[in-house]
């Protein structure tokens, strides 16, 4: 048994496998009457698609076919929305050697331990990053709904190996700092889909050189994505197990390769004194706001009104072109394995819109499920 569903009010189910005829998603709880900009959604999906020499050579035309829940003009009807994408460019022969020999770093062994030989592992099966395409369909719609309510989400690659990008201006929650943050977010949101998701152009050039080198070495690399949302009202969320951090984390860990997440000052809070970590308050334009944002916009599982921000770490792509030690699950004998197929050098660049999507779905679900009871937010 398993589930690939997320959400309380806005529920998202992802279906299909890497080499199945189709993949897709079903979304429940979307507001009736909202008009989705289908061109904007298509542009958003292009950010996830491979377009660089270090990306997988597997090309799929990710033009979603909407089965229900939305009109040809993009108007939501309030009923479950289902979208499908065909898988046309598959090569199952690349996975003959790994049918009984689990690939190190992949979910092959853990899936076999759960489902035995019924698990379809070609292309990574249901665990494949190919499934982030329907995630981005759902997330792209959620991003538009949030934006209509004044909430904006943006992300960039903060670190890849030893190359660091300029971080968002986030600890300081002053008016001046928020203006700079808005400029940084706008730079990313206005970039063309094929542009690398960095704030510093020099970081992009260094990354190009690194990934070109790693491809020639048949190796891979991970990285860190930094993501932020502005315009989130204070008072949404709830304590304990359905808190904002819990919900966002659950969604973000649904992005393949994500292995860690931290909010605000994160692990560094262990190095701070209380007088350094506490975010003081002031009245600004009639509202109470934190003057700093070590908390990452969340306290007690509930939003503070400051930008919500986190960083997540992605492991290197597990499929490498080097010989690795594994075992044959049938003979129970050792085997050396060289993974075949078409793979990326890194997941971190193409994962940026995927992380934004997961974040958007978590925020939208929280906004509708656990609104501020003081400000009157509710699901219309």
Swiss-Prot record:
Gene Ontology biological process terms in this record: amino acid biosynthetic process; aromatic amino acid family biosynthetic process; chorismate biosynthetic process
Record SUPFAM superfamilies: Chorismate synthase, AroC
Pfam families: Chorismate_synt
Gene3D superfamilies xrefs: Chorismate synthase AroC
CDD domains according to UniProt: Chorismate_synthase
Biochemical pathway: Metabolic intermediate biosynthesis; chorismate biosynthesis; chorismate from D-erythrose 4-phosphate and phosphoenolpyruvate: step 7/7
Cofactor binding note of this UniProt entry: Reduced FMN (FMNH(2)).
Cofactor: FMNH2
Keywords carried by this UniProt record: Amino-acid biosynthesis, Aromatic amino acid biosynthesis, FAD, Flavoprotein, FMN, Lyase, NADP
Residues involved in NADP(+) binding: 48
EC number: 4.2.3.5
GO molecular function terms noted in the UniProt entry: chorismate synthase activity; FMN binding
Catalytic reaction(s) noted: 5-O-(1-carboxyvinyl)-3-phosphoshikimate = chorismate + phosphate
Superkingdom field: Bacteria
Residues where FMN binds: 126-128, 300, 315-319, 342
InterPro entries: Chorismate_synth (IPR000453), Chorismate_synth_AroC_sf (IPR035904)
GO cellular component: cytosol
Family designation: Belongs to the chorismate synthase family.
Self-association and partners: Homotetramer.
HAMAP family noted in UniProt: Chorismate_synth
Summary of the function given for this chain in its UniProt record: This reaction introduces a second double bond into the aromatic ring system.
Protein's UniProt name: Chorismate synthase
